[in-house]
Amino acid sequence: LDVLKELIAMSSYNSFLEIDGEIIGFIICMREGRAHKSPNYQYFKKRHKHFLYIDRVGVKQDFLNMGLGAYMYNKLIHSDDSKEVILCAEVNTKPENLPSINFHKKIGFKLVEKKQLNIYNEVAYFELIN
């Protein structure tokens, strides 16, 4: 929970979905120039002068496959925070997160590179020019 609070404080865009006071979904994003140590954030920092990195997205299990992820991404894509910047995200490919890979491709993200982080983990880097 402390890590999540830290990320929210560092974020330049975040959105939360609530039902009856309970958070059922969230998205946390960061612009360039943040002190974020994530190797994935650092990857995009080296590639772009201006970007918005999608760091965390979550939907509560009971609310999966209801379009909430698409709703949050659509809200982000049409926000002033994402105008004239490249939206950046990474998705695990080892272990494979096929639903997320397909989701990002469906909404227009393009695969730019895959990177082996260690013997257990590999990620795919995606970008959307907004």
Residue ranges and their predicted role:
Residues 70, 94-113:
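Conserved active-site alpha-helix within GNAT-family acetyltransferase domains
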Residues 55-65, 92-94:
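A short, internal acetyl-CoA/4′-phosphopantetheine-binding micro-motif in the GNAT/acyltransferase core
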Residues 80-93:
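Conserved GNAT acetyl-CoA-binding A-motif
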Residues 59, 65-78, 106:
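Conserved acetyl-CoA-binding loop-helix of GNAT-fold acetyltransferases
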Residues 1-20:
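Active-site rim helix/loop that mediates acceptor-substrate recognition in acyltransferases
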Residues 116-130:
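C-terminal "cap" of GNAT-fold acetyltransferases
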Residues 28-56:
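Conserved acyl-donor/pantetheine-binding loop and adjacent beta-alpha core of acyl/acetyltransferases
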Residues 22-25:
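Glycine-rich acetyl-CoA-binding "A-motif" of GNAT/NAT acetyltransferases
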